[in-house]
């Protein structure tokens, strides 16, 4: 718990509220403790990675942060606004790209983004402007009037990223944004995210199963397992613990794989596997 407490803070060194401050967060679903008292914070303009296996608690943490569910206890704030007490305000500060596909395949790309702009109560003329703006930023301007059902997988994901950006968020939350994409499509998504970061200075919270993505993109990482943060630091710091040739994959196997093996060696393998499957379905 001391290690996690070291991750938490309420304000940046300049005194401004942090993009994300999470303190002693707990979330459960029935008997499954999905998130078990984690604390962390994210600095302005930072790309922060929340990594871990299925059922680690990453998506449940993100769902609290994005106001989709309420925590059992603890506190999460976004730029100083509590996600429970100021949920509507928080929603206007963040852009969220979930794991599940959110685009309507029977609408055009433009219509999808326009609808998201409407959800934020933007005036009609501004909706049109914002929709065209983010579609162009995602390289979809030429296909904006085509049905999404004709898009490739990479194009669909870029469209959903455009939806997440239409409100010009200060915090972008990406939950497995490139899962299922081929390497070229993944690279295209990240190139456009990086360009936007450079232009706007937005903060990014990322979950991913691709360790090479996390190593390249994230400035800091928290590695979760069974609802707790097992290790945290910069990619370089995490790898240095295991030696000069270590990769982030090695860190993942060391910090997560060992923990799983230890629990199964103690005879709880069946319960551990069942818990992981249940937590994975619940997020």
Regions found by a protein language model. Give the residues of each.
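Catalytic Walker B motif of ABC-type/P-loop ATPase nucleotide-binding domains
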Residues: 172-175
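Conserved catalytic motifs of ABC-family nucleotide-binding domains
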Residues: 168
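Conserved ABC ATPase "signature" region
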Residues: 114, 118, 125-143
């Amino acid at each position: 718990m001391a290690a996690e407490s070291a991750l938490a803070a309420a304000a940046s060194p300049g005194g401004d509220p942090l993009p994300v401050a999470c303190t002693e967060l707990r979330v459960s679903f029935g008997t499954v403790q999905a998130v078990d008292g984690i604390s962390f914070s994210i600095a302005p303009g930072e790309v922060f990675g929340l990594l871990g296996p299925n059922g680690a608690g990453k998506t449940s943490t993100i769902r609290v942060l994005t106001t989709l569910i309420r925590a059992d206890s603890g506190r999460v704030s976004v730029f100083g606004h509590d996600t429970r007490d100021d949920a509507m305000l928080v929603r206007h500060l963040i852009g969220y790209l979930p794991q599940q596909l959110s685009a309507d395949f029977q609408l055009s790309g433009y219509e999808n983004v326009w609808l998201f702009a409407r959800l934020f109560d933007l005036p009609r003329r501004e909706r049109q402007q914002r929709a065209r703006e983010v579609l162009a930023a995602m390289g979809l301007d030429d296909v904006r009037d085509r049905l999404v059902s004709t898009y490739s997988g990479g194009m669909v994901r870029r469209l959903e990223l455009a939806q997440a950006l239409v409100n010009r968020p200060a915090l972008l939350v990406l939950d497995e944004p490139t899962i299922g994409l081929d390497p070229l499509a993944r690279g295209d998504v990240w190139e456009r995210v990086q360009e936007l970061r450079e232009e706007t200075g937005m903060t990014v919270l990322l979950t991913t199963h691709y360790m090479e993505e996390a190593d390249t993109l994230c400035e800091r990482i928290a590695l979760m397992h069974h609802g707790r943060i097992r290790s945290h630091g910069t990619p370089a710091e995490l790898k240095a613990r295991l030696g000069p040739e270590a990769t982030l994959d090695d860190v993942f196997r060391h910090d997560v794989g060992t923990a799983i093996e230890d629990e199964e060696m103690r005879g709880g393998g069946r319960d551990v596997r069942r818990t992981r499957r249940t937590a994975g379905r619940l997020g």
